[in-house]
Amino acid sequence: MAKAKFERTKPHVNIGTIGHIDHGKTTLTAAITKVLHDAYPDLNEASAFDQIDKAPEERQRGITISIAHVEYQTETRHYAHVDCPGHADYIKNMITGAAQMDGAILVVAATDGPMPQTKEHVLLARQVGVPYIVVALNKADMVDDEEILELVELEVRELLSEYEFPGDDLPVVKVSALKALEGDKEWGQSVLDLMKAVDENIPQPERDVDKPFLMPIEDVFTITGRGTVVTGRIERGVLKVNETVDIVGIKTEKTTTTVTGIEMFRKLLDEGQAGENVGLLLRGIKREDVERGQVIIKPGSVTPHTEFEAQAYILSKDEGGRHTPFFNNYRPQFYFRTTDVTGVVTLPEGTEMVMPGDNTEMTVELIQPVAMEEGLKFAIREGGRTVGAGQVTKINK
C-alpha cells in the first residue's frame, strides 16, 4: 500500500456530513475513517460507528448540541469532520456555527432520494454560508436499476440548483457506506473516490491571517503619558505598528486613527495577528471616544448597519431558554462580539409566533449600528440570559 507521509504542513479543512435522518451520515463518517485507515494506516485511526453515534454533548453559548468530531487525512489534506446524531443538533450547529464547515458532504440515500430534511439542510447550508457541497449517493448497492440511480441524482442536482449551489457541476459519487464499512473492496474504493472528490472540489479555505484586520474592543483604558489603549482578541488579519485603522459601530460616525504601539503580555510587538490577545495604543484618541462593542478594522473593510435578516435558533425551556413563545415586535438584546444592542424583531409573513426550541428567519432593526457582515454570529439575550443564537444572512441597511 502506498505510504503517505505525515506532514504538519498539510492544509487543514473542516467538513461535515449533512442530510436526512437514516440516510447514512454516521455510517459514512465511520466508513471514511475505516477506508482511509486501511489505505494510509500511519495517518489514520478508524472510528467505529458507535463511537461517532454516541457523540458527547457540547454547550455552545448555553445551547446543548451533540456533535461528533473525527479527524482523518487523505494524501494531500488533514480533515476535521463533524457529524451530528440528531436533526435538531444539525440545525443548532449550522446556525450557531459551533463547528464551522468549509464544505459539506450531502448524504442522500439512493433508495429514497431527497427528503424534507435534505431540503432543510441544503437551505441552511446556503443561508449560513457553507460554501461547497459534494454529494454522496449512499446505499447505491441496494438499487439495481441504473435508471433509478440517474433519476435520484438528477433530483439531488435540481434541489441543489434551486438553492443556488452549482447543481449541474458539483460531484455526485455513488457509495455504499455500509458495504465499505464491512470491508467490501469495490465499495471501499467508492469511498476513496468520494474523498478524492472532496479533495478536489472543496477549496482550501482562506486563513484568518490573510483576511482584512478586525479586532472587537473588549476594554479601554488610559495610560498616563502614553494615551488610550484598547484591548481585545484579534479576530482576523494582521496589524503592524503605525498602520491606520477605523473604529466603527455603536456610534454614528467612524473614527480614524493610527496604532502607535502593539503590546502582548507587556511586551511590545511589531505586529499582532489573528488569535492574539493584544493591547493597541491609539494616537490622539480620548478614552471617551471609544467603547466596548466597537471594532477596530482595516479602513473601509466593514461598515456599521442597523437592519438585517437572520436565521436564528431559539433555546428550548430545558436549555434554559424562554418558557413562552414570542411574537412580532419582540425586543430582546442582540449580543454581537462583545456587547448587547437592543433590537426589534419582525417575523416572516405567515409566522404568528416562535416557540422555544424553534428555528426561524427574522428581520431585526437595532437601536444602534453594529459593524457587521453576512455570516456574523450573535446571541439573543434577555437581561443577560441567552435565549437564542443566530447569524446574519442578509444586510438591509
Swiss-Prot record:
Q: Which GO terms describe its cellular component?
A: cytosol
Do you know which InterPro entries this protein is assigned to? EF-Tu_GTP-bd, EF-Tu_GTPase, EFTu-like_2, EFTU_2, G_TR_CS, P-loop_NTPase, Small_GTP-bd, T_Tr_GTP-bd_dom
Q: Report the top EC class in one word.
A: hydrolase
Entry EC no(s): 3.6.5.3
List the molecular function annotations (GO) for this entry: GTP binding; GTPase activity; translation elongation factor activity
Q: What ranges does the record give for the region G1, renumbered to this chain?
A: 19-26
The reaction(s) this protein catalyses:
GTP + H2O = GDP + phosphate + H(+)
Region annotation (G3) maps to 83-86
Q: Where does Mg(2+) bind?
A: T26
Q: Which UniProt keywords apply?
A: Cytoplasm, Elongation factor, GTP-binding, Hydrolase, Magnesium, Metal-binding, Nucleotide-binding, Protein biosynthesis
Q: Where is this region: G4?
A: 138-141
- Record's superkingdom? Bacteria
Region annotated G5, chain positions: 176-178
Q: Which SUPFAM superfamilies match?
A: EF-Tu/eEF-1alpha/eIF2-gamma C-terminal domain, P-loop containing nucleoside triphosphate hydrolases, Translation proteins
Tell me where in or outside the cell this protein is found. Answer: Cytoplasm
Where do the record's region annotations for G2 lie?
A: 62-66
Family the entry assigns: Belongs to the TRAFAC class translation factor GTPase superfamily. Classic translation factor GTPase family. EF-Tu/EF-1A subfamily.
Function text: GTP hydrolase that promotes the GTP-dependent binding of aminoacyl-tRNA to the A-site of ribosomes during protein biosynthesis.
How is this protein named in the record?
A: Elongation factor Tu 1
What organism is recorded for this protein?
Streptomyces avermitilis (strain ATCC 31267 / DSM 46492 / JCM 5070 / NBRC 14893 / NCIMB 12804 / NRRL 8165 / MA-4680)
